[in-house]
Each structure stands twice: as C-alpha cells, then as structure tokens.
C-alpha cells in the first residue's frame, strides 16, 4: 500500500481530535516505558507542585556519612620530576595575506519606464453597446414638447445594427 500525504493528513487529524477531545488517564496497573532520568524529573516536579493531591516529597538528597575512624595512609613517596627540557619555539612562519579581492558592485538597476501603452480599438458606431452617445443635445432654444418628453434632447431614435454571428 502506497503512503501519501493524504494518509498523513488523516492520521494527524484523527490524533489531534483524540488529544483535543479528552485527556488520556492511565490506570495504576497500566504503564509506559520512559527513561529513568525523565521519570525522576517527573516525580520530582509532581511532588514539588503537589501532584495528585499528595504532600510535596522531601528532597532525595542525604548528606555523606562521617568517617568512622581515622584512616591510615602510608607516608607519601618522594616526588620526582624530570629536569625541565629547554624551551624550544619553532621559527615564525612568514606572514602571508591573500591578495585583496577586487571591489564588486552590482549592476545599476535600470531606470523605470512606464509600459508601452496599448492603443484602444476604434469605437464602433452602430453596435448595441457603443461608446458613442446615442442622445444628441440640441440648442436650448428648442421648446420642450411636453412634460414627459426628452427636454433638451432631440427625438432622434438611434437605429442599432446587431452584428450577425453564425455558429460553426
């Protein structure tokens, strides 16, 4: 069976919903294996903060026991050290420095220029939706014919030619 990202996502969602919905509480007869130092840290921190309603545990440190009697040790042997060797230092290596790297500067950014403008197509004159005005104003001396008329506009009714589109 191939493993893919979908399986990982589903497993993550199931695990997240299980963890977020309830806290898993182990019974005293159940257990998990954890390293001893980690278990000791957990035990100490639970005791320090009153975990499980128990009184804080006493620290697990005890002072070393006092010696029972004076221990006997033999007299120390005379210390012997070899004569000091003459100090030797290697001759200093000649100082070397790499040649300086040539100074580099990035090429200058090109000056900004506005993009070339795209010419608009010519305005159709006889289509249904056109950029040409369909109502032509007339001089204000023309009398209005009635209250509901076009007023200063002529009674010109534009004729539209809808382009014929043939399907293939």
From Swiss-Prot:
Pfam families: Vitelline_membr
Effect caused by changing residue 131 to S: Loss of egg turgidity. Females are sterile
Keyword ATP-binding: no
InterPro entries named among the record's database cross-references: Vitelline_membr_Cys-rich-dom
GO annotation, cellular component aspect: extracellular region; vitelline envelope
Record keywords, A-Z: Disulfide bond, Extracellular matrix, Repeat, Secreted, Signal
Post-translational note: Proteolytically processed after secretion into the perivitelline space. Undergoes several proteolytic processing steps during formation of the vitelline membrane; an initial processing step removing a C-terminal propeptide occurs between stage 9 and 12 of oogenesis while a second removing a N-terminal propeptide occurs between stage 11 and 14. Becomes part of a disulfide-linked network including other vitelline membrane proteins, including vml and Vm26Aa, during vitelline membrane biogenesis and maturation. Cys-123, Cys-131 and Cys-140 are involved in disulfide network formation, with Cys-131 being the most important. Undergoes both disulfide and non-disulfide cross-linking upon incorporation into the vitelline membrane.
Signal peptide start-end: 1-23
Propeptide residues, chain positions: 24-42, 155-168
Tissue: Follicle cells.
Function description: Major early eggshell protein secreted by follicle cells into the perivitelline space and incorporated into the vitelline membrane. Involved in vitelline membrane biogenesis; forms a cross-linked network with other vitelline membrane components.
Domain notes: The tetrapeptide (A-A-P-[AV]) repeats found throughout the protein are also present in many proteins constituting the protective envelope of other species.
Record family assignment: Belongs to the vitelline membrane protein family.
Protein name: Vitelline membrane protein Vm26Ab
Organism: Drosophila melanogaster
